[in-house]
Amino acid sequence: MTAQVDRYVSFKGIDWVGRSREIFARLQSHIDQANSPFWPYFTRQRKLAHSQGLDDLRVLHNYLPTLRELLENMGDLKTLGMLEELEQICM
């Protein structure tokens, strides 16, 4: 049996899970409004990523440019700031 490697060992002391959760909680209102074809796609890709054992930090990282553009266009500077802070710390 091989040992499980923690790929986030360098994030010790950083609540990246909580930060990712907070960002997704804020994104949920945009997802629910579905004013862009991106949101249903993004939701499907998140479910697929989870089924492959990937976490929300990875999902956010994969869609960072698109999320940044959408949040800027919607004027959601709070969520954009949270996403950019997470990017600086963990991505």
From Swiss-Prot:
Domain of life (superkingdom): Bacteria
Alphabetized Pfam families for the sequence: CowN
UniProt keyword terms in alphabetical order: Nitrogen fixation
GO biological process: nitrogen fixation
InterPro entries with a match to the protein in the record: CowN
The keyword Zinc belongs to this UniProt entry's keyword annotation: no
The protein's role, per its UniProt record: Is required to sustain N(2)-dependent growth in the presence of low levels of carbon monoxide (CO). Probably acts by protecting the N(2) fixation ability of the nitrogenase complex, which is inactivated in the presence of CO.
Family listed: Belongs to the CowN family.
Protein name: N(2)-fixation sustaining protein CowN
Organism of provenance: Beijerinckia indica subsp. indica (strain ATCC 9039 / DSM 1715 / NCIMB 8712)
Taxonomic lineage: Bacteria, Pseudomonadati, Pseudomonadota, Alphaproteobacteria, Hyphomicrobiales
